[in-house]
């Protein structure tokens, strides 16, 4: 019996690396730890003599001990120690990047975040070439595309976190309006992670009823507007971006991959094959419903959209094509 217990404890656990220990990164690490999904490696910069990744990892490790969660948590100051600890990662989550500052153009912001991203993708190629990457940094759709280009990974192994969060926000606003259990509400948001996201009301339900049968057109318009402005509302109230719900969205994706759950969820993915024909979109990463399992994106869910929803999705894709063209230009300058 004792030998079996020891063998169980020593069994190899999934390794999940999180690059960036800001609010989103640290909360991803926290949730991964509390759920015991695998060993957690937290990477961050060495700042003015301080090592936040090491400090936060130590705190999380002590929490895990307190709660009898048998995983390892380690912090790495990557500009001091490098990225060698990425070796053996099953999943790498990229949360690091800079927010848009006053006076920065869209091109300036993208260029700066591409430079940061390239440092990470070079390290992932060297040390974690078999991993699945989840991109959280913004602009997430464009940086997911750039990650595929920079790593040369199969597109199914590079996934952007967007639609899971946007769908949760849509669900929250529906719940606030009707006041029933979360479990009985299903919502779907596709497209870009931004003002051109597409809340898909034809595939959003309260119980067995489409929300279009529950709410009036004006009420639905209000719900859509609230969903599109959900992130901006938090910024206006707090002065910084959300982090609890984004972190939870990442961890839901990680859990489906690690445990091969094959859950269907909207993610920013590179559109190809049958999905490209169905949605009439190609050459970009955009939020679509996919099956997430141990291989990453295992399949596309081909949703039949209304005429209006299809037009809105194509409008979203057109904007992303412009960003992709800009990204290709800037990548050549790196």
Swiss-Prot record:
- If you read the UniProt record, what top EC class would you report for this enzyme, in one word? oxidoreductase
Instruction: Please list the residues that bind substrate.
Output: 100, 106, 138, 169
Q: Which reaction does it catalyse?
A: (S)-malate + NAD(+) = oxaloacetate + NADH + H(+)
A GO cellular component entry from the record: cytoplasm
InterPro entries reported for this sequence: L-lactate/malate_DH (IPR001557), Lactate/malate_DH_C (IPR022383), Lactate/malate_DH_N (IPR001236), Lactate_DH/Glyco_Ohase_4_C (IPR015955), Malate_DH_type3 (IPR011275), NAD(P)-bd_dom_sf (IPR036291)
- What GO biological process term is on the record, naming one? tricarboxylic acid cycle
| Annotated keywords | NAD, Oxidoreductase, Tricarboxylic acid cycle
Give one Pfam hit by family name: Ldh_1_C
* Residues where NAD(+) binds: 19-25, 113, 136-138
Could you give a GO molecular-function term held by this entry?
L-malate dehydrogenase (NAD+) activity
Q: Where is the signal peptide?
A: none
Q: Which domain of life is it from?
A: Bacteria
Question: Does this entry carry the keyword NAD?
Answer: yes
Q: Where is the active site?
A: 193
Which family is this protein grouped under? Belongs to the LDH/MDH superfamily.
The record ties this protein, via NCBIfam families, to: PRK06223.1
Main function: Catalyzes the reversible oxidation of malate to oxaloacetate.
Protein name, per record: Malate dehydrogenase 2
Q: Which organism is it from?
A: Aquifex aeolicus (strain VF5)
